[in-house]
Swiss-Prot record:
Pathway participation: Mycotoxin biosynthesis
Listed transmembrane segments: none
Function according to Swiss-Prot or TrEMBL: O-glucose prenyltransferase; part of the 2 gene clusters that mediate the biosynthesis of fusicoccins, diterpene glucosides that display phytohormone-like activity and function as potent activators of plasma membrane H(+)-ATPases in plants by modifying 14-3-3 proteins and cause the plant disease constriction canker.
Sites where the protein binds L-tryptophan: A95, P96
Comment on pH dependence: Optimum pH is 8.0.
Gene Ontology biological process: alkaloid metabolic process
One example GO MF annotation: transferase activity, transferring alkyl or aryl (other than methyl) groups
E.C. no: 2.5.1.-
One Pfam family cited in the UniProt record for this chain: Trp_DMAT
UniProt: substrate binding residues: K210, Y212, R279, K281, Y283, Y368, Y435
Protein name per the record: O-glucose prenyltransferase PaPT
Enzymatic class: transferase
Residues in the signal sequence: none
The species this protein was found in: Phomopsis amygdali (Fusicoccum amygdali)
Length: 453
């Protein structure tokens, strides 16, 4: 799931790769004003060590493949991460980035994923002048990604940029007023409405891009339902909107008639590839319920989805559910919600995504569980993740998980408050079987203190 970082501060570490990318390559494709950017250098020093450690954790990457991915992030992503935090924030900063490693039961190695909010584009000085939403800067950034990667199709992305980014002067004025008075927690603390996010799957042999759009801004300025706005945007996509519409209609009916609790629609994502192959991904959150019975109702769309893959997926999820919410096996009845450490809020509650392609009859449902809401320490989360990986059949990854965490995050107090793990997501498909994705905060816990500057 796309990560939203609210303060634009920083984080990451030192790794063992021989590659030295401390200065930008002469082949860089980002705008001239971003070259030799001290802000980008700061973010790069923070991101590189964690990436290198997670490559080792995932396994399956050659040194050259790691260098290719690291160079791409250094040259094309770091310049868009925003300004350098100052004072004590520099030593305990959080980057506008989230990294994750995906494990599936049918593959021996994991895959590293990298996602971020481009603060340079969406909150730079230009947003106070002629580009209030950062749309022009976002478009420039997307073109640079397309040039660097080659195999990127922005057909749908351009359409959604136009639909979701607030640019009309009257809408911008209404949004600024709403940001002062009407934002939900914790966004109200920052008086800022995220509108755009992106991610890359950094597979050993390729890079693929995904883009994410947040409907909150448009909902605030138009008064429209965020769910309706997202589903209407899906139906209107060209080409293949008509092939996406049946599942969009099914989800609309489920959320409005048979879902056993209120859900908020927070994101719409797409693969930035040929629309014939691209998935549409709708993200919703539940601040009311997190019981397993509630999850079962969502995965089956109120009993509509009864196919073998859905039922097998629920059976496996049931076997690890106690690990994901940090309770003893059998302790939590299926009908009971698991109390969270903090009052659930945006990004601090249970999330689901529904993804489908044109022509699909049903969506694939994924679940996202905020680990820091249920466990007291990263060590406990690591123990639960190791047990979950073992059930996935990934014994080697399970055995080495805590060791990798210690190596990748050398400054982390694993027995203190949670500072490393964000979420664990789960899904099951007939093609891949069960899979888990573990999401990590990108912060200075991965960096020796004297390496931040």
């Amino acid at each position: 799931m796309a990560n939203v970082v609210l303060d634009g501060s920083a984080a990451p570490a030192k790794a063992g790769l021989p590659l030295d990318l401390s200065s930008p390559s002469k082949q860089t494709n980002f705008p001239t004003e971003l070259e030799s950017n001290s802000n980008a250098d700061f973010w790069w020093r923070l991101c590189r060590p964690e990436m290198a450690g997670l490559f080792k954790q995932a396994g399956g990457y050659t040194e050259l493949q790691q260098e290719s991915h690291l160079r791409f992030v250094r040259e094309h992503c770091a310049p868009w991460m925003g300004t350098v935090p100052t004072g004590h924030m520099a030593n305990e900063a959080v980057a506008p980035v989230e990294m994750s490693v995906n494990y599936i039961s049918s593959r021996d190695e994991g895959v590293l994923r990298f996602q971020m909010e481009p603060f340079t584009a969406v909150s730079g000085p230009h947003t106070q002048a002629d580009d209030p939403s950062g749309k022009k800067a976002v478009c420039s950034m997307l073109r640079s990604f397309q040039h660097a990667l080659g195999d990127v199709d922005l057909t749908w992305t351009w359409q959604l940029v136009d639909k979701f980014m607030v640019t009309a002067p009257d809408e911008v004025a209404r949004l600024r007023e709403a940001e002062r008075t009407s934002l939900p927690p914790p966004l109200d603390l920052y008086q800022r409405t995220p509108q755009f996010n992106f991610a890359f799957d950094l597979s050993p042999d390729k890079k693929s891009m995904k883009t994410y759009f947040l409907p909150l801004a448009k909902s605030l300025v138009t008064g429209s339902s965020a769910l309706d706005y997202c589903l209407d945007a899906v139906r209107s996509l060209e080409p293949h909107g008509e092939g996406l519409s049946p599942v969009a209609d099914l989800l609309h009916q489920f959320f409005n008639t048979s879902c056993p609790g209120h859900m908020s629609c927070d994101y719409l994502g797409i693969d930035s590839t040929n629309p014939k192959r691209s998935r549409v991904k709708l993200y919703v959150s539940s601040q009311q319920h997190n019981s397993f019975n509630f999850i079962r109702a969502v995965f089956t769309l109120g009993g509509i989805a009864k196919d073998e893959a859905t039922l097998r997926g629920l059976e496996f999820l049931r076997s690890i559910w106690h690990l994901l919410v940090n309770v003893d096996e059998g302790e939590l009845p299926d009908s009971s919600d698991r109390p969270a450490k903090q009052l659930p809020f945006f990004l601090g509650c249970l999330y689901f995504s529904f993804e489908w392609r044109a022509g699909d009859r049903l969506p694939l449902v994924k679940l996202y569980v905020p680990q820091w809401q249920y466990a007291q320490s990263d060590r406990k989360i690591a123990k639960n993740i190791s047990a979950s990986l073992r059930k996935l059949g990934r014994d080697e990854a399970a055995d080495e998980y805590l060791t990798h965490i210690k190596q990748t995050f050398p400054r982390a107090d694993l027995d203190g408050n949670v500072s490393i793990h964000n979420q664990v997501s789960y899904a099951y498909s007939a093609e891949t079987g069960a899979y888990l994705t573990i999401y990590y905060s990108v912060n200075s816990k991965a960096v020796a203190r004297d390496q931040i500057y």
